[in-house]
From Swiss-Prot:
Subcellular location: Cytoplasm
Organism: Corynebacterium aurimucosum (strain ATCC 700975 / DSM 44827 / CIP 107346 / CN-1) (Corynebacterium nigricans)
Keyword tags: ATP-binding, Cytoplasm, Ligase, Magnesium, Metal-binding, Nucleotide-binding, Purine biosynthesis
Function: Part of the phosphoribosylformylglycinamidine synthase complex involved in the purines biosynthetic pathway. Catalyzes the ATP-dependent conversion of formylglycinamide ribonucleotide (FGAR) and glutamine to yield formylglycinamidine ribonucleotide (FGAM) and glutamate. The FGAM synthase complex is composed of three subunits. PurQ produces an ammonia molecule by converting glutamine to glutamate. PurL transfers the ammonia molecule to FGAR to form FGAM in an ATP-dependent manner.
Residues noted as binding ATP in the record, renumbered to the chain: Y60, R104, N508, G545
Residues at which substrate binds: S107, H108, N109, H110, R129, Q254, E326, S327, Q328, S548
Protein name per its UniProtKB record: Phosphoribosylformylglycinamidine synthase subunit PurL
Length: 765
């Protein structure tokens, strides 16, 4: 059957044909600019390409003006180890000895609300392909998840599906899930956040970039066939113009096949090893429209594509549909003519569908044909790189001052408060979630479950490895976006440092409400400045990132949620520092590093006590978040690198010292006796304040003096606050509670809520 296409010839002959550009997310002035670029109206296929590539997701048109600050602040020394940075599929860091590590975090928020399982699964698949496109082997994934209240009916629909999608896709790929975070808050009702992180390794010489160069070189599409799934994933594709009157539902959520991706990974690695790949791009958001325009725009010529050669799995697809499809597990590569057959042989070996769909040309135009007719003829750079950049209004919200007025917190008996905290949805066990993930597949996972950071061995001979952590606090960030983002950076940095790894690079995923809201844009700008300035203070670069806007339900935006990931390198993973206390014959001494202040703004105790008092809508959020001096984080990192006097270490964050002590003891059941008077004059502050730059460490009695001396040398405040005991009790300020009692309360909450979740993973109506 011949499909009706709107051709370039028809566009010139029918200049005033009405087009559904508003339905596709384009504004009047944007559409007018497209007509100006082309000198005519766009064809349906061209309109599709511009609409998806000029979408917020692909073009960063509302955030780009602020994201430039990362480049403006990065020093030459910081950038010296970056092999690929902001603007590439993923950041790549040179870690020495000819080796490199690449990592990135990406959002898949809206699809995961519509269809939780597939939305989350394809989020994992997409970030893995970003890593593959850099020439790397993916070695691990992590996730940052945000949902509405744990007891809300919609959370019971969304959470099991999201977790199932992540676990199914990651487990089938054979990639260990080495850590993550799950947070519940009213602001995420109707708009969950699903941020997936992937890390990969490669040789420096094997780095691949997304560009098409060399006139006459061939464009190869390989992987799964192209279908109707995912159309409209990054913009709105809802016009009958593109369907020629046919009545069919075009699902905006992609459908993933992890086994196809697993084979695609191995196929890519063999292609890289063969040395025949000139440039490569994965097909994710905006599909072939993105891959072809970006490859051509980044190269030294133009490109011609024949859509008749694209392997399809649906009949009668129009050119617009083929270009906008976000069918998963696809890659696009550029190879020299003499290597086409070798390319096809390798794909055939892995049973991967492959087709030659075009070639690199002279000039700067992207020309696309379908059924013998030209349906796209446009400068590639205008599609990929020249979306309008908006300097949207931003202003400090009128309500910010009132929000920052601290109203105090109710103080209760220490053990009573501690049990409430560990049993709360905010801090209770996530085993219900994490036990669905394979954490040790491939055999290189050193730390993951309940650890400060995921630790992986990357060299079996030397024991060299990496540590990765990702953190965020929407509560802190709403109170003070700049400081809240710095706190997320500080915690991720500290989590990596306490393993004994040296932090070397940063990635991020910035999740916010509508950029058309000046309040939101102020939050976003403050966060960008906090992260960029913080990176300079720590002396490590931001290697890449992602922005997700329009996260809101109605007019109510989510908590501003900057997810910050930090990568560290450790010389010998066998010497990495764990975070759990064991049962040993001789008591271990507990030392608190860092200074404790009366800081409860945005704290978990503030949230839990507010809910207890019936202030659920407010979540008790008020005051200023803890203040962080990133120089203190650097001193802590110096303390831990190469420190063999520490037997266990755990950073202090949500819930403060008491929660950290429980987390260190819960697995073994060992008792702890803590003298809170050494921490702060107020026992409640000592137990539950969330002051930054603090770590609880354990050491043997004969190494205490050495440890304290090293702390002094590094400029880190340190004080002995207690020791382990054999009575199984956690003793705090004259009160005590059994560790086993706390563990039972901690373990019961989520299974009780989700053990029989009705309607889990059902598609939203």
């Amino acid at each position: 059957m011949t499909v009706h296409n709107d051709t370039v010839e028809q566009a010139a002959a029918q200049p005033e044909l009405e087009q559904p550009y508003r339905e596709l997310g384009l504004k009047d002035d944007e559409y007018a600019h497209i007509r100006e670029i082309l000198g005519r109206r766009p064809t349906d296929a061209e309109l599709t390409m511009y609409s998806v590539m000029w979408s917020e997701h692909c073009s960063y048109k509302s955030s780009k003006t602020h994201l430039r600050y990362f480049g403006e602040t990065m020093t030459e020394e910081m950038g010296s180890k970056i092999l690929a940075g902001i603007g590439e599929n993923a950041g790549v860091v040179d870690i020495g000895d000819g080796n490199a590590v690449t990592f990135r975090v990406e959002s898949h928020n809206h699809p995961s609300y519509v269809e939780p399982h597939q939305g989350a699964a394809t989020g994992v698949g997409g970030i893995v392909r970003d890593i593959m496109a850099m020439g790397a082997r993916p070695i691990a994934v992590m996730d940052q998840l945000r949902f509405g209240p744990a007891d809300a009916p919609d959370t019971k629909r969304v959470l099991p599906g999201v977790v199932g999608g992540i676990s199914h896709y990651g487990n089938c790929l054979g990639l260990p899930n080495i850590g993550g975070e799950t947070v519940f808050d009213e602001s995420y009702s109707g708009n969950p956040l699903v941020n997936a992180l992937c890390v990969g390794t490669l040789k420096v010489d094997d780095l691949k970039l997304a560009f098409a160069s060399g006139t006459g070189n061939k464009v190869m599409l390989f992987g799964s066939r192209t279908g109707l799934d995912g159309i409209g994933g990054v913009s709105v594709l809802a016009s009958d113009t593109f369907e020629d009157g046919a009545e069919r539902k075009l699902p905006a959520v992609q459908v993933g096949d992890p086994f196809a991706e697993k084979v695609l990974i191995e196929c890519c690695l063999e292609l890289y090893k063969s040395g025949i790949v000139v440039g490569i791009q994965d097909l994710g958001g905006a599909g072939l429209a993105c891959a072809t325009s970006e490859l051509a725009a980044a190269g030294d010529g133009g490109m011609e594509i024949n859509l008749d050669n694209v392997p399809l799995r649906a009949k009668d697809m129009t050119a617009a549909e083929i270009l906008a499809s976000e069918s998963q597990e696809r890659m696009c590569a550029v190879v020299t003519p003499e290597n086409v057959e070798k390319f096809k042989e390798i794909c055939a070996h892995w049973d991967v569908t492959c087709a030659e769909i075009g070639e690199v040309t002279t000039g700067k135009h992207l020309i696309i044909r379908h059924q013998g007719e030209v349906v796209v003829d446009a400068p590639a750079g205008t599609i990929a790189d020249e979306a309008p950049v908006y300097d949207r209004p931003y202003a400090r919200p009128e309500w910010q001052d009132a929000l920052q007025e601290f109203k105090g917190v109710e103080k209760q008996d220490l053990t009573v408060a501690l049990k409430k905290l560990v049993a709360s949805p905010a801090l209770c066990s996530r085993d219900f979630i994490t036990e669905q993930y394979d954490r040790y597949v491939r055999g290189n996972t050193v730390q993951s479950h309940h650890a400060n950071a995921g630790v992986l061995r990357i060299d079996e001979e030397t024991g060299r490895g990496i540590a990765v952590s990702a953190d965020a606090s929407g509560r802190y960030t709403k109170l003070d976006p700049n400081m809240g983002t710095r706190l997320a950076l500080a915690e991720a940095y500290r989590n990596v440092a306490v393993t004994g790894a040296r932090p070397v690079a940063i990635t991020n995923c910035l999740n916010y409400g509508s950029p058309e809201n000046p309040d939101v844009m102020w939050q976003f700008r403050e966060s960008v400045h906090g992260l960029a300035d913080g990176a300079v203070e720590l002396g490590i670069p931001v290697s890449g990132g992602n922005v997700s806007f329009y996260n809101q339900t109605g007019e109510e935006p989510i908590l501003p949620t900057p997810v910050v990931g930090v990568l560290g390198v450790i010389d010998d993973v066998h010497k990495s520092i764990g975070n759990e206390l064991g049962l040993v014959e001789e008591p271990e001494v507990l030392v608190l590093l860092g200074e404790t202040k009366d800081e409860f703004g945005g704290s978990i105790w503030q949230q839990v006590s507010a809910r207890e008092q019936g202030n659920e809508s407010e979540n008790g959020l008020n005051g200023l978040p803890p203040q962080v001096d990133l120089a203190n984080e650097q001193r802590l990192a110096d303390f831990f690198v190469g420190n063999e006097g520490v037997t266990a270490a755990h950073d202090l964050s949500e819930g403060g010292l008491a929660v950290t002590a429980f987390e260190m003891a819960k697995r073994s059941g060992v008792g702890l006796n803590l003298d809170l008077s050494k921490v702060h004059e107020d026992a409640f502050v000592a137990a539950f304040s969330e002051s930054a730059s603090r770590v609880l460490v354990a050491t043997t009695a004969d190494r205490v003096d050495m440890l304290l001396h090293r702390a002094e040398e590094c400029g880190v405040p340190a004080v002995v606050i207690g020791q382990t005991t054999d009575n199984g009790e956690l003793e705090l300020g004259g009160e005590s509670i059994a560790v086993s009692e706390l563990r039972e309360a901690w373990a019961a909450t989520l299974p009780d809520l989700f053990g029989h979740a009705v309607g889990a993973n059902s598609v939203v109506e």
